[in-house]
Amino acid sequence: MGMGQEKHTDAASQSRDPEAVAAHENDQLRQRNHALAKALTRATEELRKAKAQLEQFMAPPLTMATMVRVHRCSTDEHGVRHASAEILNGNRRQIVPLSPTVNPAQLGSGQGVLLDANMVIVDSCETPTTGPMRAVSESLADGRLIVSDVGGNRGVVMRASAVARTPINVDDRVVIDPSGTYVLSVLPQEQAQDLLLEETPDVSFTDIGGLDEQIARIRDAVQLPFQHRDLFDRFDLKAPKGVLLYGPPGNGKTLIAKAIAHELAAGSGNDGVFLSVKGPELLNKFVGESERLIRRIFERAKELSGAGRPVIVFIDEMDSLLRTRGTGVSSDVETTIVPQFLTELDGVESLDDVMVIGASNRIDMIDPAVLRPGRLDVKIHVTRPDETAAMAITRHYLTDALPLEPGRDADALAASLVRDLFRRDESRLLATLDEQGRRRGIYMADIVSGAMLRNIVDRAKTKAVKAEILHGSVSRDDEPQGITEARIHEAIDDEYEQNRSTINETDPGQWLRINALTLAADGV
């Protein structure tokens, strides 16, 4: 027998050794048991998850309610706590028990609580921050608040514990719970500063042309009292509380207000402040909100007027905010806005450095109480420019420093512009309006304004720029460079066509009122 056969015989005999076979089988069983244990663990975990989900699905629903107060909390001789609480469940007040797991000391008024099917408080939840919005009308001494809704209906509410120490002022907006019992949160206010254009103007009276008479009047009304207070005191003369600038649109009312703020600042040595707000921006559909914004504007003016700093409060489009009450022309919102404005205006007498200037295209629509002496004392009519004033205005925008037509100066071009604009012939006839048997021809001269003159000059400048771009710097005999008389007349033609289209597309009567015109019979 060879050596290879002997080794094979020994290996076979060893493989048939009972101990080795038993050890091998034990290893296999151990591996199977380990795998079964893992499978059993996974199955147990899955069973637990399924049971938890089943318990969740089978759990009764919880009802949300609002906590009012702890009604009773005591401990008997066995050490068992007995506690109950008063809650608001919808509009129903109920007294319900507290679960032993709920700490009564951690429940505050207005807080949300959860009730189980047996009407037991089993948990608390966050105080809701959504619900009906109300405006605070009055704060009572005991901490309660009088609030009003959009319709003006008033009610008394209490503070939830979450806002017990939060400062709440009149006019603040608050969120109340659905039952109308608790204030849950205070909303951030819409700041009047968001509506104000607050600036230090750099416009002076020298920048305004054609309004010498109006400038002289507003200097006397506003600038003298600010800069010569000692003389006014000696003569027992009070400064006017306000000035109303009225007249057709686009004729410099805002520029005059800015210029007076600039002049007052220069005279006082401090930076003057120009607070500008448009009347329609103050109108708000929520009751009391417009009045609150008016109060905030005057409060802001008072803050800025410290240390002799002059402040101009400029209210544009005043006729939209302070319309005549009781005429049926406006909604009843003016019945509260006008008195609030008058109250603030009457209080301006204690503010030596605050002046109110209003601007309006329709003085006939402003409430008479606003216009009476002692309120807006000075009324200045900013009229449409005549030919002399139009020449002065045009020269502010058309100067010799601009690239002009060779051989022409700014005076000659401005005079040509004004002559063309004030012609009363068919080429400048915008429309013939007829209302209730009265006919009138409306010409460009009837609606000319400072804004229109500037627009015409800008049109001519644009035409000159386009010509420069098209032809470059090459001079051509057939088309002179710069602002030419021909381009100015083309600009007037463009303005004429634009205004004629506007008249034809609008109601004639309304257009006349907006532009402060009347239909006087003139034989046209």
From Swiss-Prot:
Gene3D superfamilies: 1.10.8.60, Nucleic acid-binding proteins, P-loop containing nucleotide triphosphate hydrolases. Residues 1-29 are annotated as: Disordered. Pfam families: AAA, Prot_ATP_ID_OB_C, Prot_ATP_ID_OB_N. ATP binds at G250, N251, G252, K253, T254, L255. The keyword Coiled coil applies. One of its GO terms (molecular function) is ATP binding. SMART domains: AAA. Residues 22-59 form a coiled coil. Keywords: ATP-binding, Coiled coil, Nucleotide-binding. One of its GO terms (cellular component) is proteasome complex. InterPro entries: AAA+_ATPase (IPR003593), AAA_ATPase_domain (IPR050168), ATPase_AAA_core (IPR003959), ATPase_AAA_CS (IPR003960), NA-bd_OB-fold (IPR012340), P-loop_NTPase (IPR027417), Prot_ATP_ID_OB_2nd (IPR032501), Prot_ATP_ID_OB_N (IPR041626). GO terms for biological process: modification-dependent protein catabolic process; proteasomal protein catabolic process. Homohexamer. Assembles into a hexameric ring structure. PANTHER family: AAA-FAMILY ATPASE (PTHR23077), PROTEASOME-ASSOCIATED ATPASE (PTHR23077:SF144). Belongs to the AAA ATPase family. This is AAA ATPase forming ring-shaped complexes. The lineage of its organism: Bacteria, Bacillati, Actinomycetota, Actinomycetes, Bifidobacteriales.
